């Protein structure tokens, strides 16, 4: 990861740390994945942090991106078949990594989109919106995000849960440091 200097503290931050800060404060998470190999073993630590430590799973939509690379987006039957296989793969990998129970699996939201079908470019798709909506399946993402908001009690409820997530993140980082400091002070006294 590249480094960046924090203007306030003049400390060097890694982009991953910056990203983690913003994600921990997110109201809703769109977890965008490569459709070819959606959830890699190398992502285990980040997945555990996101969904166990921060408890963001109920507020996450998993997005299989560039789905036109793994399925014919013009053939609805093929698209749905490939999506079912990839969705099962995502659910299975998340279950293995996070130890999800059946209730958690049932609440998972997975969609597949092709944001730029056939790499035709934004200019083309802006002048062909109906075809874009049909081929991109972007409506499924819009529906999934609206359902996540509704299923989590609406915007105010999600904002309150975000506050709890931020507190949980602070406690996860700071509490062990404070306990160590207290132990050191007790040992000195």
Q: Language model features by range: what are they?
A:
Residues 1-153:
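Globular "head" domains of long coiled-coil molecular machines
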Residues 121, 130-189:
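Extended helical scaffolds that flank P-loop GTPase cores
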């Amino acid at each position: 990861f590249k480094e960046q200097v924090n203007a306030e503290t003049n400390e060097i931050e890694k982009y991953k740390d910056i990203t983690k800060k913003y994600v921990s404060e997110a109201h809703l998470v769109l977890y965008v994945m490569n459709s070819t190999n959606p959830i890699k073993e190398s992502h285990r630590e980040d997945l555990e942090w996101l969904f166990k430590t921060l408890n963001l799973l109920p507020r996450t939509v998993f997005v299989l991106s560039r789905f036109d690379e793994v399925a014919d987006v013009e053939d609805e039957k093929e698209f749905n078949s490939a999506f079912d296989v990839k969705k099962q793969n995502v659910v299975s990998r998340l279950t293995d990594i996070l130890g999800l129970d059946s209730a958690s699996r049932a609440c998972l939201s997975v969609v597949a989109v092709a944001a730029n079908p056939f790499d035709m470019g934004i200019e083309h798709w802006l002048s062909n919106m109906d075809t874009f909506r049909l081929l991109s399946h972007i409506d499924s993402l819009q529906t999934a995000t609206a359902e996540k908001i509704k299923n989590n009690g609406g915007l105010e409820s999600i904002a309150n849960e975000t506050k709890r997530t931020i507190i949980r993140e602070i406690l996860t980082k700071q509490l062990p440091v404070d306990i160590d400091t207290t132990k050191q002070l007790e040992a000195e006294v």
